[in-house]
C-alpha cells in the first residue's frame, strides 16, 4: 500500500445463493462467474453496476483476469441479460434480493453471505473458479496547507490503532501482522488483480461494462 494511506477494511466477492430458490427452480449450482451467463439463470440473478458500486469491480476483476477483456464482454453481456431489471446500484442489493427470494443467485461480499448462513438463513455461497478478488478501504489525511485540521492526523491514528478490533466484526479479513481471519471467512480461492487498481483502470472497466448493457 502507498505510504500515505492505511487500509482499514477489506472485502472479497463471491457468488451468493438462496438454497430454497435453487431447489424450487431446479437450478444447477454455478461454480464460476462465467456460469452466470448460462440461459438457465435468466431472471434468476442479481448483480451490481460498476458505475455506482465498487462491489461490481470484484466481478469484473475476476472475469477479466480469467478471460481477457474481449471474452469478458461476451460473458458480461449475457450476465446482464440474465439479470435484467436486477442490475443494482447498491453493493448490498443483490444479497438483499437473494435473501428475500426475489432471485436465486447474486454476486456480493463474501463476509455478508458467511454471516447470513451462520444466522440460519437459506443462504449459501460459492467461491468462483476465477477467484475471490478483494478491495480495501483506506484512510489518509489530506494536506490542505493552512486549512489542514490539526486534529485530523490524531483522529486517523486513533482509528488505525484502536478501531480494527471492532471493524473486524463486520469486515473480518486480516490486514495487519498479528491479526487472524477465522476459518469461516477464509475464502477458497483468493486472487489479486495483476494491475494496480487505479482510477484510470476503474474508468476503463466502467466503460467496458457500459458496452455490455
Regions found by a protein language model. Name each.
Residues 40-51, 75-80, 87-88, 119-143, 158-180:
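Periplasmic-binding protein-like
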Residues 71, 75, 137, 147-159, ...:
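Short amphipathic alpha-helical coupling segments at ligand-binding clamshell hinges
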Amino acid at each position: 500500500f502507498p505510504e500515505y494511506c492505511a487500509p482499514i477494511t477489506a472485502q472479497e466477492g463471491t457468488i451468493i445463493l438462496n438454497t430454497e430458490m435453487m431447489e424450487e427452480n431446479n437450478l444447477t449450482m454455478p461454480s464460476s462467474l462465467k456460469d452466470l451467463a448460462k440461459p438457465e439463470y435468466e431472471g434468476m440473478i442479481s448483480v451490481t453496476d460498476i458505475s455506482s458500486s465498487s462491489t461490481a469491480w470484484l466481478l469484473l476483476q475476476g472475469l477479466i483476469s480469467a478471460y481477457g477483456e474481449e471474452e469478458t464482454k461476451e460473458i458480461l453481456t449475457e450476465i446482464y441479460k440474465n439479470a435484467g431489471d436486477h442490475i443494482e446500484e447498491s453493493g448490498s442489493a443483490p444479497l438483499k434480493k437473494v435473501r428475500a427470494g426475489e432471485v436465486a443467485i447474486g454476486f456480493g461480499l463474501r463476509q455478508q453471505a458467511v454471516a447470513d448462513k451462520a444466522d440460519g438463513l437459506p443462504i449459501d455461497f460459492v467461491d468462483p473458479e476465477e477467484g475471490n478478488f478483494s478491495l480495501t478501504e483506506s484512510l489518509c489525511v489530506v494536506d490542505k496547507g493552512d486549512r489542514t485540521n490539526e486534529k485530523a492526523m490524531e483522529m486517523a491514528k486513533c482509528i488505525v490503532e484502536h478501531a480494527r478490533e471492532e471493524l473486524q466484526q463486520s469486515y473480518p479479513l486480516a490486514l495487519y501482522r498479528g491479526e487472524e481471519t477465522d476459518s469461516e471467512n477464509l475464502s477458497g480461492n483468493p486472487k489479486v488483480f495483476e494491475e494496480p487498481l487505479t482510477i484510470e483502470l476503474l474508468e476503463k472497466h466502467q466503460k467496458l461494462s457500459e458496452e455490455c448493457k
